[in-house]
Amino acid sequence: MKFSNLFSTRVASLAFAFLALIPAAEAHYTSATPPTSGPTVPGNKACLKDGVAYAPENAPEEVKRAIWATNFLRNKPYVWGGGHDSFYVDGYDCSGTVSFLLKHANRLDHPMASKELTNYGGSGKGRWITVYAKDGHVFAVVAGLRLDTSGMGFGEDGPRWRLTGRSAWGFTARHPEGL
């Protein structure tokens, strides 16, 4: 066999092997299981360290699991419509992010758009989780931390925990039953 044929055969084999790995990597990435345990802090308020939310020890297990699972999203990009068809995607928008949180609190079976979340659960603020929704945007406050996809500066868009609040003017406050 000539060197050029051998080289071409090996390059083609390597290329096919590499391409065969791509779907497997994508499937693993989009279907990865978020954690069901994580860091805690004493008391009733969550805290934020290096972008990771620490669940309050006094919170119900559903709230802790929701916080730990949502930490899984913290470096995902903002993608308009992300999380509407599935809880596990490459990027999330505001309603996909809040839907993910509520799913992991065992309070939501399917993703909901921001307008739908204006009628979610019970009216008013919750003890542990409050969803602030309006047509076009939604965010949540969980044990004192804000979960939102809109940041204050460049590169801050996407699912993130934040220490600072935001105006709830024009939003409807809702909460998961029991939380």
Where in this protein do the model-derived segments appear?
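Active-site nucleophile-His-acid catalytic modules used for acyl/amide transfer and hydrolysis
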Residues: 73-91
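Bacterial N-terminal signal peptides that target proteins for export
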Residues: 2-14
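...with weaker cross-activation on analogous glycine-rich loops/strands in unrelated enzymes
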Residues: 56, 64-67, 99, 104-179
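Residues at secondary-structure transition points
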Residues: 16, 87-88, 112
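Short linear capping/connector segments at secondary-structure termini
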Residues: 48-52, 81-86, 115-120
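Active-site nucleophilic cysteine motif
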Residues: 86-105
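Intrinsically disordered, low-complexity
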Residues: 2, 16, 21-78, 153-179
